[in-house]
């Protein structure tokens, strides 16, 4: 999902910047979208291990399976590290746009897909209840947009 930045970022002076990302970028941007897309956590781990030069099993395995992809059933983290586009907008220079509609549809569809598990999670039950209050029309639009986006990239 690409969106022009609000301001022009300074060009990087280090070629290695491509292969390094700060932890929060990995967790809350890359990991977030991969979880919202419901990509197999083993594939997510493989991708991170192959792409980043500072990837080590002792760091990546707990970060991917325990935090980023919530694949350990909540042993390490109390909630999935997912967010709506609002978080991305607050933490970056990305403005609201078509990308945010797609991101939000993926977010709400993830909540719908895992509603029965998330409703008993104290940190996620509010979002489940917000989803439940959406109209049937809104839910259908969320589902259609999230499915069409997934089909366009897989």
Residue ranges and their predicted role:
Residues 16-154:
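C-terminal catalytic domain of photolyase/cryptochrome flavoproteins
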Residues 1-15, 19:
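Single conserved hydrophobic/aromatic residue that forms the stacking wall/gate
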């Amino acid at each position: 999902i690409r969106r022009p930045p609000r301001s022009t970022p300074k060009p990087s002076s280090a070629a290695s910047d491509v292969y390094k990302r700060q932890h929060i970028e990995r967790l809350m941007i890359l990991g977030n979208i991969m979880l919202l897309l419901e990509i197999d956590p083993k594939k997510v781990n493989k991708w991170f291990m192959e792409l980043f030069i500072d990837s080590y099993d002792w760091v990546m395995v707990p970060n991917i399976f325990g935090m980023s992809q919530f694949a350990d059933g909540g042993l390490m983290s109390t909630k999935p590290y997912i967010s709506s586009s609002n978080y991305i907008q607050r933490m970056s220079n990305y403005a609201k746009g078509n990308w945010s509609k797609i991101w939000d549809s993926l977010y709400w569809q993830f909540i719908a897909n895992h509603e029965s598990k998330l409703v008993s999670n104290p940190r996620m039950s509010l979002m489940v209840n917000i989803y439940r209050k959406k109209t049937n029309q809104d839910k259908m639009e969320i589902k259609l947009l999230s499915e069409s986006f997934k089909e366009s990239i897989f």
